[in-house]
């Protein structure tokens, strides 16, 4: 592990961007020993194991090149969708903005997901509410730059349908009235409300917006938890220099049977000052 960690640390010290993708978690086999109790635990476990697996397979060529963008993945778990089976699959994603205030993160995440899965478009993308400062309520202004980019992606046929997460009736109504491409779904966290709010239910029914449930924490990946996972996997690194920009979780479901064929995480991180 020592030599692996030193090589990985040297690469990360020179790179400016890290692209981490887990591949299909259902293909992990021996890497997946325990069943995590929360989404945050699963994610942290995935980040660490992906980093460990990647650092154990660093080639001498990579060390000589010192690439600016590092592609970190579990190679044996990568699984593209067979083009002949694409029509039978529903490809969904949820995008979490972590440390980025750039709407281009949305396009980067969708482009990378399409590339990883070998598809031309995603069937649905839900955006988690972007982070806001403590004491500040999420407003339409916070959502607009990300939604504009999602609309562009729908218009360029990169995404079929787009949705929101954790918007109350007022927020959803404001977005709906402003948006060119309307949200077709809104996720509600059942931990915060055991029963769907009646005003939200009525509005969603009126405008044909699907209300879904989720159990993601308010902050699935924090800067601190990412840096801790990085430090534990690769001790020879200045982990505090790295900031996660966004995280995308995807799933591929066989439409006719409702079973999950593939699921995984993709994230992008930047080194501060690079």
From Swiss-Prot:
Keywords: Acetylation, Glutathione biosynthesis, Phosphoprotein. The modification N6-acetyllysine is found at residue 263. SUPFAM superfamilies: NAD(P)-linked oxidoreductase (SSF51430). The modification Phosphoserine is found at residue 59. Gene3D superfamilies: NADP-dependent oxidoreductase domain. One of its GO terms (molecular function) is glutamate-cysteine ligase regulator activity. One of its GO terms (biological process) is cysteine metabolic process. It comes from the Eukaryota. Pathway: Sulfur metabolism; glutathione biosynthesis; glutathione from L-cysteine and L-glutamate: step 1/2. The keyword Nucleus does not apply. Heterodimer of a catalytic heavy chain and a regulatory light chain. This is Glutamate--cysteine ligase regulatory subunit. It comes from Bos taurus (Bovine). The gene is GCLM.
């Amino acid at each position: 592990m020592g030599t692996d960690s030193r090589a990985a640390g040297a690469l990360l010290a020179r790179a400016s961007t890290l692209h981490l993708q887990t591949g299909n978690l259902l293909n992990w086999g021996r890497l997946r020993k325990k069943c995590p109790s929360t989404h945050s635990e699963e994610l942290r476990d995935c980040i660490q194991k992906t980093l460990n697996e990647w650092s154990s397979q660093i080639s001498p060529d990579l060390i000589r090149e010192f690439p600016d963008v590092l592609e970190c993945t579990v190679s044996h778990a990568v699984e593209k969708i067979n083009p002949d089976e694409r029509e039978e699959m529903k490809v969904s994603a949820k995008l979490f903005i972590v440390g980025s205030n750039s709407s281009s993160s949305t396009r980067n995440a969708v482009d990378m997901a399409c590339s990883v899965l070998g598809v031309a478009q995603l069937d649905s993308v839900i955006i988690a509410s972007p982070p806001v400062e403590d004491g500040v309520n999420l407003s339409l202004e916070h959502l607009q730059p990300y939604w504009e980019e999602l609309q562009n992606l729908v218009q360029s046929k990169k995404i079929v349908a787009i949705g929101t997460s954790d918007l109350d009736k007022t927020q959803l109504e404001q977005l709906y009235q402003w948006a060119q491409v309307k949200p077709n779904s809104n996720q509600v966290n059942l931990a915060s409300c055991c029963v769907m709010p009646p005003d939200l239910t009525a509005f969603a029914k009126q405008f044909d917006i699907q209300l879904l449930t989720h159990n993601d924490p308010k902050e699935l990946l924090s800067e601190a938890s990412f840096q801790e996972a990085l430090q534990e996997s690769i001790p020879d690194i200045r982990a505090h220099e790295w900031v996660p920009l966004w995280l995308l979780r995807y799933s591929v479901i066989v439409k006719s049977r409702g079973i999950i064929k593939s699921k995984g995480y993709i994230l992008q991180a930047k080194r501060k000052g690079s």
